[in-house]
Amino acid sequence: MKIVIAPDSFKESLSAMAVADAIEAGFKQVLPNATYVKLPMADGGEGTVQSLVDATGGRILPVEVTAPLGNKVQGFVGLLGDGERAVIEMAAASGIHLVAPEQRNPLLTSSFGTGELILAALEMGVKHLILGIGGSATNDGGAGMIQALGGKLLKADGSAIELGGAGLAELATIDLSGLDPRLGELVIEVACDVNNPLCGPKGASAVFGPQKGATPEMVVELDANLSRYADCIEQALGKQVKDIPGAGAAGGMGAALVGLLGAELKPGIQIVIEALKLAEEVADADLVITGEGRIDSQTIHGKTPIGVARCAKQFGKPVIGISGCLTDDCGVVHDHGLDAVFAVVNRAMSLPEALESASTNIQLTVRNVAALYQLKG
């Protein structure tokens, strides 16, 4: 009997690998002789680096980078076990959490540090880069990233524009002749779960700018600057990026990644499923177990349990979901591949207690799930 265990993390409690370990321990109490394959998952957001590194036997390497407002911080690159792939999170260098609430101003914040993370990955010799772009503090269209990688964003007088969303107001030309040549051989996959265009009422500035500290007046200015940026990209490369689905992700980072670096935007869970070759493992499995900290009606929108379930259902495999808690509206997940879902909190307890005892509670619950599964046979 082969059982594939492919959960996401339980946020603020257990990493995806720790959840997988707990599920395995619970099942082994009933089915000690089964073959267990553990694939810690993620959906492209927080924890993706850790999950992919854990699943492939890789390592996380520290990198000093430039934070959104120019100070230095410790970022990181996840080098996967094959040594040819790396995964980075934009938030590690350009994240909103790196800027104090009273200092958040997307006219000033820059994605320069994300470019430094990419350079660090190139120095490691990688040929394939997975980039998560959630949680950014920036609205510069990825201009800072391009500058860090050697691109020149110039004013009419030939001088470089300032870093940040405001600098784009003076952009006249884009010169990519100085880009790091190794980028030409780098495959870049971007975990992107939004379809917002670059500009307009559904664009980066209008939708996400206020979350990053933009006032209504700033939103107007930022949107105009990104429009100018897109025009310069079209002039330099002949590529239209304003209306590309996902171009507005991460303050316009999607536009730079696709338009200037030739990256591909894909749902985060799809990237992780492909990177870990989940389909190959579930093809001959008897049972697939997934999960995350909370299963509710939003789980069907790009979250790990549904991604895993849909993959498993391609092969007709039964899928069980394990969660910290289930909401009243979670029943919708049964229409998307999860055959049964179980909450691990077994009595009234405070949130801190639930987080602290998550591993034990998972094992207790899963042991009973395993017993039920054994009865069916």
Predicted regions located by residue number:
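N-terminal loops that bind phosphate or other acidic moieties
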Residues: M1-I133, A137-G377
